Amino acid sequence: MIALGSDHAGLPLKLEIIKLLEERGLAYKDYGTTSPERVDYPVYGRLAAEAVARGECERGLIFCGTGVGISLSANKVPGIRCVVCSDCYTAVLSRQHNDANMLALGARVVGVDLARMIVNMWLDAVFEGGRHAQRVGMISRIERDYLKEPGGPQDPAAEQPGRQR
């Protein structure tokens, strides 16, 4: 299952990629938006990323104007490794070397044909493991270290507005 998300700017490209997923017979869940009305990309990047992080979806494809804002939002969710790609080489290596579990595309940056090629190659690429697994593990340790920091999500004081340390 592939999680999908977009803001209004990314919606037309997301709809084109949905056609590609259907052609390939791949299951997906669309976390929105489904409207061309202006919306905030962090909402939809987070929803799709949380589905991937929870294991409800194996990978995610997200879209906004540049791919940058929605990828930044997704990458705040622990366990997410989202990359912005506008070329096939980076897309393939993001899977092979970095085990990227989400791909962000900018609808104002890549055209439909290039986006289809990027998505196809990203979906087909396989994580190589080996020395790359060690590096991905190092990235995960950095993430875990910051989650333990005061004020992080595991800190009970972080849930109490106005409380200072």
Feature-to-residue mapping (PLM):
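Short amphipathic alpha-helical segments
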Residues: L15-I18, L72-K76, R116
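A short beta-strand-loop structural module common to alpha/beta enzyme folds
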Residues: A27-R38
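Acidic, glycine-rich active-site loops and adjacent beta-strand->loop/helix elements
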Residues: T34-S35, G65-V68, K76, C88-T90, ...
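Helix-adjacent hinge/juxtasegments
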Residues: Y44-V84
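Glycine-rich phosphate/diphosphate-binding loop of Rossmann-like nucleotide-binding domains
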Residues: A3-E23
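C-terminal binding/interaction regions
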Residues: A3-G5, A9-G10, C88-R165
